Amino acid sequence: MFLNEKVGAVIVAAGQSRRMGGQDKIFARLSGKPVLAHTLSVFQQSPEIDDIALVVSEHNLKKAKELVKEYNFSKVIAICSGGELRQDSVSSGLTALCDCGWVLIHDGARPLLDPVSIPEGLEAAKLCGSAVAAVPLKDTVKEISPEGLVEKTLPREKLISVQTPQVFRADIIQKAYRRVGITATDDAQLVEKLKLPVKIFSGAYANIKITTPEDLLMAEILLKKGR
C-alpha cells in the first residue's frame, strides 16, 4: 500500500532473448535460481507491493506458472501472455492490475534491483505522478550519421541512462497507453508525449539488464559481492 492505495507491479519478461546464445534469459540460472525468480523475489518481499502481474511470452506461460508455484510467489495474481511489442506486454499487465492506484513497471531481466528502489520510486512519483530510475552516464556519447560518421558530441552532464522500475499513478500510465500512438522504448516516453512531468530518482549501476551471456556473468559477480 502507498497513500492508502494498492500498489501493483508489472514484471515484463516477454522478450525474445536474441542475444543470449540460444538460452532464454529469464530462465537462465543465476546463483542456482532462474533470473526471473530473483526479480520476482524482490517484489514478493517488498511490503509496499500488493499485487504482481507477470507478463511472459506465450511459449513460456507453462514454465512461468511452474516457477511461481515452486517459489510460492503469492503476490502474483496474473500471468499474462505478452504481445509483439513491449507496449503490448505492459498493457496486458496493466489490465490485470485494474484496481491498483499505483503501478511499478520493471524488466524481468533486471534481477539485481535494490529493494529500497521501490519505496524511493513511489515517493518520487508522489510529487508529480510519474518517476523513473536512472543513473548518470559514465561514457562520452556521440551522435552519428547513417553512414557511421560522428556528427556531434552530446553534453554528458545533461544525459542520463534510464532503468526500471518506472513508477506511475495508475490513471496516468493507463491514459498514456490509451492515447499515445507511438512505439516507445520505455513507458515514461508515453507519459512525456502527454506533456506530463516525469521525476528522476536514483537507480544503481548494479541494476543491470541481462541481455547477453556476458551480462549474466557480471550479475553472478555482483550477486556474490552483495551488489
From Swiss-Prot:
Single biological process term from Gene Ontology: isopentenyl diphosphate biosynthetic process, methylerythritol 4-phosphate pathway
Catalytic activity entry: 2-C-methyl-D-erythritol 4-phosphate + CTP + H(+) = 4-CDP-2-C-methyl-D-erythritol + diphosphate
SUPFAM superfamilies: Nucleotide-diphospho-sugar transferases
EC number in record: 2.7.7.60
Segments passing through the bilayer: none
Gene3D superfamilies: Spore Coat Polysaccharide Biosynthesis Protein SpsA, Chain A (3.90.550.10)
Enzyme class, spelled out: transferase
Annotated keywords: Isoprene biosynthesis, Nucleotidyltransferase, Transferase
Gene Ontology MF annotations: 2-C-methyl-D-erythritol 4-phosphate cytidylyltransferase activity
Pfam family, one: IspD
Site entry (Positions MEP for the nucleophilic attack), positions: 156, 209
Superkingdom, natural source: Bacteria
Site (Transition state stabilizer) location in chain: 19, 25
Pathway stated in the Swiss-Prot or TrEMBL entry: Isoprenoid biosynthesis; isopentenyl diphosphate biosynthesis via DXP pathway; isopentenyl diphosphate from 1-deoxy-D-xylulose 5-phosphate: step 2/6
HAMAP family: IspD
Recorded family membership: Belongs to the IspD/TarI cytidylyltransferase family. IspD subfamily.
Protein name in the entry: 2-C-methyl-D-erythritol 4-phosphate cytidylyltransferase
Organism the protein comes from: Dehalococcoides mccartyi (strain ATCC BAA-2266 / KCTC 15142 / 195)
Gene assigned in the entry: ispD
